[in-house]
UniProtKB/Swiss-Prot annotation:
<dbReference type="GO" id="GO:0022625">
    <property type="term" value="C:cytosolic large ribosomal subunit"/>
</dbReference>
<feature type="region of interest" description="Disordered">
    <location>
        <begin position="14"/>
        <end position="36"/>
    </location>
</feature>
<dbReference type="GO" id="GO:0006412">
    <property type="term" value="P:translation"/>
</dbReference>
<dbReference type="InterPro" id="IPR018261">
    <property type="entry name" value="Ribosomal_bL27_CS"/>
</dbReference>
<protein>
    <recommendedName>
        <fullName>Large ribosomal subunit protein bL27</fullName>
    </recommendedName>
</protein>
<dbReference type="Pfam" id="PF01016">
    <property type="entry name" value="Ribosomal_L27"/>
</dbReference>
<dbReference type="GO" id="GO:0003735">
    <property type="term" value="F:structural constituent of ribosome"/>
</dbReference>
<feature type="compositionally biased region" description="Basic and acidic residues">
    <location>
        <begin position="21"/>
        <end position="36"/>
    </location>
</feature>
<keyword id="KW-0687">Ribonucleoprotein</keyword>
<comment type="similarity">
    <text>Belongs to the bacterial ribosomal protein bL27 family.</text>
</comment>
<feature type="propeptide">
    <location>
        <begin position="1"/>
        <end position="10"/>
    </location>
</feature>
<keyword id="KW-0689">Ribosomal protein</keyword>
<dbReference type="InterPro" id="IPR001684">
    <property type="entry name" value="Ribosomal_bL27"/>
</dbReference>
Length: 93
């Protein structure tokens, strides 16, 4: 006589699936690099941005990536203009 036993083995550990999360891009360090009233040298970055959140004023240049930089050495001055726009200028001292 032959007996066939139907044995079934169950997992002793739960199977762990992979996830598609768990990565992020490096931060771009955008924002103000010089604050109002602070001294800056010519060529120094004043504000890093995407688009023109802050507009260039007197003695301030705008780079290809919309970064604002000082054209001369002086004091940084942020000012409101228009309805809801801001510009940054460098005042020579």
């Amino acid at each position: 006589m032959r007996f066939l036993l139907g044995l079934q083995y169950f997992a002793s550990k739960k199977g762990v699936g992979s996830t598609k999360n768990g990565r992020d891009s490096e931060s771009k360090r955008l924002g103000a690099k010089k604050s109002d009233g602070q001294f800056t040298n010519a060529g120094s970055i004043i504000y890093r941005q995407r688009g023109t959140k802050i507009h260039p004023g007197l003695n301030v240049g705008r780079g290809g990536d919309d970064t604002l930089f000082a054209l001369i050495s002086g004091i940084v001055k942020y000012e409101k203009f228009g309805k809801n726009r801001t510009r940054v200028s460098v005042i020579p001292n």
